[in-house]
Amino acid sequence: MTTTYAVLSEGLEKNYGEVHALRGLDLAVPEGTVCGLLGPNGAGKTTAVRILTTLTAPTGGRALVAGHDVTRDPAAVRRAIGVTGQYASVDGDLTGRENLRLFARLAGLRGRAGRARADELLERFGLGEAADRTAATWSGGMKRRLDLAAGLVTRPRVLFLDEPTTGLDPAAREQIWTAVRELVEKGSEGTTVLLTTQYLEEADRLAGEIVVVDRGRVAATGTPARLKARIGARAEVTVAEPGTLARAAAVLDQLTGGRPVLDEQRLTVGVTVLDGALDGTLTLPRIIRELDAAGVPVTDAALRPPTLDEVFLRLTQPHGTAVEAATADQEYAA
């Protein structure tokens, strides 16, 4: 079965003078999926999104969005996409219903069609009861949901969500996550979502595929589970006697090939089980058996997968603030 890609870029480059924001970025996002774009500040995420949404031109390479070349046919790209940023673009002096009808008119949906689409989205995002109140009286989470609804007025084939829950409290963030999940899982419009976020939990919860960007290139790509498997699980044991810490570390070193970390205060030894070196269902029992054979009594033992935060830190490198500042300044100077 042939895969159709909603977003496809090959060798995408962007230079700002001597600053190389993108250095050959390759993306392939299948239709009807949620792809999370992660990376440290200055990695090139925002630059990539600006190119894919036709807000800036690439220096090199090519990109297709919904089958249209972003350089050769930017108007067609704009007709096929929706964009929602980290700041709600709604008008506080208008009601929620008036906001969506305005967006509908701007998108060419007038009269009955525009009113029907606005009403449909208000109900879909749980905003019907507040629809006729001015948006200025709404909570931050409600405004962000309205902003997300506005991005869907035209039934876009690709929706770009740029840090959509920044600054929201946990409850409001969960509401946005639910709306995005339902958009892809239950929706009939076939929308593809490209999500950039600073919340790694957000990418873990929403994205079927994650692309980690570092220094303008793709550092890694895969499902959250596969990315976590790349750095392995972490085994940690708590010994009963302080004098057995070194022995416990030696056993873990021999079993896993990792570098045990000792904590004399907590009487623990932790080590990363690299790249699935041992089967996940067998690792912990085997560790306990080997420790027992070595005369190391333990009071606790655990094996846990790494968090996406740990994956992120392992796969990315520290950036220089000078490069970050130069890129950001030139991107937003216009």
Question: Language-model segments: which ranges?
Answer:
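ABC transporter nucleotide-binding domains
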Residues: T4-S9, K14-D214, A219-A220
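Conserved NTP-handling cores and scaffolds of large molecular machines
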Residues: A107, I231, A235, T256, ...
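ABC transporter nucleotide-binding domain
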Residues: T178-A277, A302
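C-terminal coupling/interaction segments
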Residues: D275-A334
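Non-catalytic surface loops within mature trypsin-like serine protease
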Residues: E31, E129, E241-G243, V273-D275, ...
